[in-house]
Amino acid sequence: MEDCFLISAAVYSPSEKDAIAESDPTEPLSPYGATKLLSEQLINKVGVAENFTSISLRYFNVVGSANIDFGDNSRDNLVPKVFAAIKAGKRPEIYGDDYPTKDGTCIRDYIHVQDLAEAHLVALKQLEKGKVDEIYNVGSGTGYSVKEMMEQMSKSMGVDLNPVTVPRRAGDSPKLIASIKKIEKDLGWRPKATLKEMIDSAWAAEKGAK
């Protein structure tokens, strides 16, 4: 028996490194990250006990849409949260601008949902070839700050977002950027979408939402 599981980059400890590798420490700050790490540990235990083969994909921040009819309804994520604020006539919020980053806002690695889906398919094909128990990061390998994201969103949407800074949220790491060297080497996977393409597709789906 084999399967591919989606975990999350939220399992990682806060890091000053330019890119986080799969072997880096996992001490999540948030309850969400803790539950994802527990899931991964349980998968590993089942694999040992039941001869269960798996690949876990630690995905970073998913953005965009592969179909105009399917947008992101998770209002906890940055991009749809900004969309919701603008549509409601409110100013989008930046949670803290005093982090040890280039502009004081959190830095994250964003990946298009279509690229994530393709990584999943590549992982499943690898499982079909034989016994594999691996963990892979799935991201773009590039980090963007909240302010940089909002600048691109402003361009894609054609509006001035005029964000307001509010206090930090508990559990937010200053920086999370994926090292994707392992998945590139082992599976031959690389992301294709640019940040502009991610946000353009997300905005198109948001406008097309019924």
Task: Please name every model-derived segment.
Residues 1-5, 53-55, 135:
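Conserved catalytic-site loops of classical short-chain dehydrogenases/reductases
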Residues 86-210:
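C-terminal substrate-binding subdomain of Rossmann-fold SDR/epimerase-dehydratase oxidoreductases
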Residues 62-63, 99:
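Hydrophobic pocket-lining residues within nucleotide cofactor-binding pockets
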Residues 7-9:
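Conserved NAD(P)H cofactor-binding loop of Rossmann-fold oxidoreductase domains
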Residues 78-79, 112:
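C-terminal catalytic core of Y-nucleophile DNA break-rejoin enzymes
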Residues 46, 80-88:
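Short amphipathic alpha-helices and their capping/turn segments at secondary-structure boundaries
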Residues 11-61, 67-77:
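Catalytic helix-loop patch of NAD(P)-dependent Rossmann-fold dehydrogenases
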